[in-house]
């Protein structure tokens, strides 16, 4: 062991020794922190892979259940009526089994593709315990895209325009129509 002869030498030797220990301690901390970061990244990647696999399995289950429900509802709709055409894909609401058309705010809009006089369309809807749609009920909703140019309850065609239009000759003109049934 070396013994310094003056205070200056003693300080420099002691400082060098302390400085060396500090460097070794800092290097150990850096290594430990680096290892901890690597371990946390590996754990994060494993958890993301696991969660992705779980979500893929759940998505496949939901899609197959949804596909089966749509197939069942389409088969029921085809069996119930041969002259009706469903105007949209089967609606997934609580009334899906009893509405073979567009469901909106408690009403079922059933599309009839056969051209009828206004009186015949109104009578056909009455036999089904339903009515022709009111223009005011559908004008500001997404339904207007479907019911446009069909018979309205006032005997005129339902149109997007709000300008005055010529009254239709309901004794001769034929149109497609919707019957609106209130769902319970």
From Swiss-Prot:
The chain crosses the membrane at residues 34-56. Glycans are attached at residue 134. It is found in: Virion membrane; Host membrane. It holds the Pfam family Chordopox_A33R. Keywords: Disulfide bond, Glycoprotein, Host membrane, Membrane, Signal-anchor, Transmembrane, Transmembrane helix, Viral envelope protein, Virion. It is a single-pass type II membrane protein. Residues 1-33 are intravirion. The keyword Iron does not apply. GO terms for cellular component: host cell membrane; membrane; viral envelope; virion membrane. Residues 98-184 are annotated as: C-type lectin-like domain. Its main location: virion. The keyword Protein biosynthesis does not apply. It comes from the Viruses. Residues 57-184 are virion surface. Homodimer, disulfide-linked. Interacts with protein OPG190. Interacts (via C-terminus) with protein OPG164. Interacts with OPG162. Belongs to the orthopoxvirus OPG161 family. Forms a complex with OPG162 and OPG190 to coordinate the incorporation of OPG164 into wrapped enveloped virion (EV) membranes and, subsequently, the production of actin tails. Therefore plays an essential role in efficient cell-to-cell spread of viral particles. This is Protein OPG161. It comes from Variola virus (isolate Human/India/Ind3/1967) (VARV). The gene is OPG161.
């Amino acid at each position: 062991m070396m013994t310094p002869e003056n205070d200056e030498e003693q300080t420099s030797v002691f400082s060098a020794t302390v400085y060396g220990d500090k460097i070794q301690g800092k290097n150990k901390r850096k290594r430990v922190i680096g290892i901890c970061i690597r371990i946390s990244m590996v754990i994060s990647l494993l958890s993301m892979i696991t969660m992705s696999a779980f979500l893929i399995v759940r998505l496949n289950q939901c899609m197959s259940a949804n596909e089966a429900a749509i197939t069942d509802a389409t088969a029921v709709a085809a069996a119930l009526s041969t002259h009706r055409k469903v105007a949209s894909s089967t609606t997934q609401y609580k009334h899906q089994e009893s509405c073979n058309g567009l469901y909106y705010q408690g009403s079922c809009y059933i599309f009839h593709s056969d051209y009828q006089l206004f009186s015949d369309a109104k009578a056909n809807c009455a036999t089904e315990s339903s009515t022709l749609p009111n223009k005011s009920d559908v004008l500001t909703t997404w339904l207007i895209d479907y019911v446009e140019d069909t018979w309205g309850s006032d005997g005129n065609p339902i149109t997007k325009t709000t300008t005055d239009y010529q009254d239709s000759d309901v004794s001769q003109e034929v149109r497609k129509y919707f019957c609106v049934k209130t769902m319970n």
